[in-house]
């Protein structure tokens, strides 16, 4: 018996930028029936890094064969493997091209056992809602604590990490390995909703506004409304705006 049905959609808008550097996808695994992988990556200074995220993720996910029961630790490792492999490939490509591509990463993996596992690197975000109410939003706090605890940075320097090329937490940074923050929730059920988005979207909304948009509309309707509102609030000065919306709904009874 299916615990839920998945409704998902992706949407993008170029904003006032000359090109779209974000990439989004919703994938199913070739050897993992019932598993769904949602991805969002924001390419810095071009789309190459974000494109590599999607390419590597598909390769790894297609080779993934799950066990018989819930195993969130294994799903989390799959997401870490995607980050590590993509980071390595981007760095190898930089040796050939002479240009270093960077990209953020947000991944959400849903299993038919009711597991939701997510991972992120950089300033793209994942939100989780229950019936439209915000319950979780990814942030930089774990990375900041890592910089203070292991790298012995001051609190001020750690919190300003985005301004430093040395400390920039992205895939492809030759100066620093990506710091992956992972989380999961068991017992997913109809009414649970997720939003993966780039900073071109989350910058213009409160958590409550995003949750309300997802709760009252289909993924397509919600994404169209959010893109239109982001363009309005940015006054034509917004950047690339991208999102993946995933909603768990009641399965249709036969």
Q: Language model features by range: what are they?
A:
Residues 1-254:
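PP2C/PPM-type serine/threonine phosphatase catalytic domain
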């Amino acid at each position: 018996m299916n615990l839920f049905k998945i409704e998902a959609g992706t949407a993008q808008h170029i904003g006032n930028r000359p090109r779209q550097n974000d990439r989004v996808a919703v994938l199913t695994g070739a050897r993992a029936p019932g598993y769904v992988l949602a991805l969002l990556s924001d390419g810095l200074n071009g789309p190459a890094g974000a494109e590599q995220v999607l390419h590597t993720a598909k390769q790894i996910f297609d080779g993934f064969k799950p066990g018989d029961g819930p195993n969130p630790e294994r799903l989390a490792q799959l997401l870490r493997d995607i980050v590590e492999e993509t980071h390595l490939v981007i760095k190898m490509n930089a040796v050939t091209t002479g240009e270093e591509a960077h990209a953020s990463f947000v991944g959400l993996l849903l299993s038919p056992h009711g597991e939701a596992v997510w991972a992120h690197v950089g300033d793209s975000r994942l939100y989780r809602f229950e019936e439209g109410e915000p319950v979780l939003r990814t942030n930089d706090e774990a990375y900041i604590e890592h910089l203070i605890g292991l790298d012995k940075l001051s609190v001020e320097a750690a919190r300003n990490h985005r301004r430093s090329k040395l400390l920039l937490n992205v895939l492809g940074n030759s100066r620093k390995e990506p710091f992956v923050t992972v989380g999961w929730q068991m017992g997913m059920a109809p009414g649970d909703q997720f939003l993966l988005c780039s900073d071109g979207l989350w910058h213009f909304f409160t958590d409550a506004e995003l949750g309300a948009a997802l709760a009252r509309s289909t993924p397509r309707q919600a994404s169209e409304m959010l893109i239109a509102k982001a363009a309005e609030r940015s006054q034509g000065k917004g950047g690339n705006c991208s999102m993946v919306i995933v909603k768990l709904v009641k399965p249709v009874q036969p």
